[in-house]
């Protein structure tokens, strides 16, 4: 049975396909597939006429969301596919084509021929969960950034109306602080709060807001240097509405993210400090760990590795390259904070790096590298985290 290599050049409204036979390395077919149901059915009919799905290797460049529908269609039709880094295809074309030609027809043929030169690594079967979690976790990240933006805007309003308010709460707008702003808003109203107001406030803070704090806040409100202006009240109410709306959406997203990651339940969820949200980001960004040959590739993917400067008689390491997903890097580094507090092995490793003279952030980076090695080992060995086996 002959093997076939299928290169697909992805674009928004159409996909150009090239099929090459492994037997004689000749082009079997070149055609264009529209990005609709009829086009996809035409592609499937063509593929099914060639051979069994196991004998067909499909590849296309990783092109953001334009390939999503095709990927899901191929997965449901039991055809494997391999996503290719566009940089690799560009370099391959440079080495095989002398003319500076850039057409969809040439690109799809280059992808097909490139597939013949490399080890075929099809996309993992859990594509639905991987893509869904990537979409949801990145949306959550954007919403959190928006929420932070509105918190800054709320602070700007308070600088005019009640500048003593935020310092009273140690520069943090906690749930108790937000409750006060929602129910009273202005310093004038807070200055006139009574015992009934305190009872409600105490319940809202779960008995954490003392009567002494309450009286101190009333005093600050009565003697504030802020201005009492209805325009600022309107602005504050609008910002609080937007802030609360984002909080609600983030909570809904987190529930869905938790549900999806629990269905997959990767082994690294058993590591202390990696909760459902962190695990979801790691799973979404890394995908199938088996696609990585060693932990070093995972380090490079996350951008947690030093740059290397080797020229002439000089050779030294540089700063962390910070390539790849910033969200993944952030989650991995943050996951190390509880690890060095509650896990003796990671804590000892962190202390060792600090004793070597490394600063806190540099030492945390080394802990993150160790964490990545642990994640790699857990998934490749198909076991949960066991502190007794950690070295």
Task: Enumerate the language-model features and the residues they cover.
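A detector of single, family-specific signature residues
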Residues: 1-391
